[in-house]
């Protein structure tokens, strides 16, 4: 019987799962849309929804709780400064999951997870800024 099985283990240890979702939540906050497998997306959604709720609270304790779950301070800053303000009037449902076919090679079901009312220019913006900074450093 599968009573009281509250989450998917995804064939990973607790530490690996914790690191996986910290990285994925950070990527979703940074790019506002990521493509991953459907089970990972379904597990990521409640984690990110709780982080947005913390960002809407906006106090120091909430910021520290979010920083404990995320790996980079820049993700915490964007979460509280941009996303918390964007969703201050929305009562939940900050993230949508759309099925995206199957992965070639192992036929794993894929999904796109994204913020509702997302900023379409955010996807890849950090990568472009990093590349421009590296090229400017190489030239000088």
Curated annotation (Swiss-Prot):
Alphabetized GO MF terms: structural constituent of ribosome
Lipid metabolism listed as a keyword: no
GO cellular component terms attached to this protein's record: cytosolic large ribosomal subunit
The organism's place on the tree of life at top rank: Bacteria
UniProt-listed PROSITE patterns: RIBOSOMAL_L17
GO biological process, one term: translation
InterPro entries (alphabetical): Ribosomal_bL17 (IPR000456), Ribosomal_bL17_CS (IPR047859), Ribosomal_bL17_sf (IPR036373)
Keyword terms of this UniProt record: Ribonucleoprotein, Ribosomal protein
Family: Belongs to the bacterial ribosomal protein bL17 family.
Quaternary assembly: Part of the 50S ribosomal subunit. Contacts protein L32.
Name by which UniProt lists this protein: Large ribosomal subunit protein bL17
Organism: Paracoccus denitrificans (strain Pd 1222)
Organism placement in taxonomy: Bacteria, Pseudomonadati, Pseudomonadota, Alphaproteobacteria, Rhodobacterales
């Amino acid at each position: 019987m599968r009573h009281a099985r509250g989450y998917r283990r995804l064939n990973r240890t607790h530490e690996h799962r914790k690191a996986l979702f910290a990285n994925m939540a950070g990527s979703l906050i940074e790019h506002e849309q990521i493509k991953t497998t459907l089970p990972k997306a379904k597990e990521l959604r409640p984690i990110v929804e709780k982080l947005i709720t913390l960002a809407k609270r906006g106090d120091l304790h909430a910021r520290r709780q979010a920083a404990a779950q995320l790996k980079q301070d820049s993700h915490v800053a964007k979460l509280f400064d941009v996303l918390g303000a964007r969703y201050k009037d929305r009562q939940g449902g900050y993230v949508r999951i759309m099925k995206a076919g199957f992965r070639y090679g192992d036929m794993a079901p894929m999904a796109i997870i994204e913020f509702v009312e997302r900023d379409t220019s955010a996807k890849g913006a950090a990568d472009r800024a990093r590349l421009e900074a590296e090229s400017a450093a190489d030239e000088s």
